[in-house]
């Protein structure tokens, strides 16, 4: 689905990708991060995104926001705070790559949108 769309010159947006596997299945579950990364890269045939947007928020703040939704948490969302801290730490390690845009998720929606739009505009010009 992704490769044909890219070949046709289309923009492809995805909510999560292999970086999520590295952060959650690797670091957060305390598995071998390098091994999870290699398997994940194999699964996506080494197709890396041009841009990965990381909405950064502390684990405590994320859990607090999640609990305010009134929706029952899924299996992953029921994990303890240290699980999410490990995932966040891994995301921040991954985010040293230039394809990442780290956005402070404490900002207003308008501020977040402005940062994302500016970075996306650089890519599609």
Which residues does each predicted region cover?
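N-terminal phosphate/diphosphate-binding loop that engages ATP/GTP or pyrophosphate donors
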Residues: 1-5
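Hydrophobic/aromatic beta-strand patches that form the interior of the parallel beta-sheet core
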Residues: 13, 51-53, 101-103
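Conserved beta-strand edge residues that scaffold enzyme active sites
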Residues: 19-20, 109
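A glycine- and Lys/Arg-enriched "phosphate-lid" helix/loop adjacent to the NTP-binding pocket
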Residues: 20-89
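NTP-dependent small-molecule kinase module
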Residues: 60-125
């Amino acid at each position: 689905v992704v490769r044909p769309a890219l070949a046709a010159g289309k923009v492809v947006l995805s909510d999560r990708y292999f970086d999520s596997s590295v952060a959650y299945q690797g670091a957060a579950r305390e598995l071998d991060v390098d091994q999870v990364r290699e398997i994940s890269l194999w699964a996506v045939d080494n197709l890396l995104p041009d841009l990965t947007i990381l909405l950064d928020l502390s684990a405590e703040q994320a859990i607090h926001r999640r609990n305010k939704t009134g929706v029952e948490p899924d299996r992953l969302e029921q994990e303890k705070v240290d699980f999410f801290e490990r995932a966040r730490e891994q995301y921040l390690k991954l985010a040293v790559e230039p394809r990442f845009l780290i956005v402070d998720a404490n900002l207003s929606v308008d501020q977040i949108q402005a940062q994302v739009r500016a970075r996306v505009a650089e890519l599609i010009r």
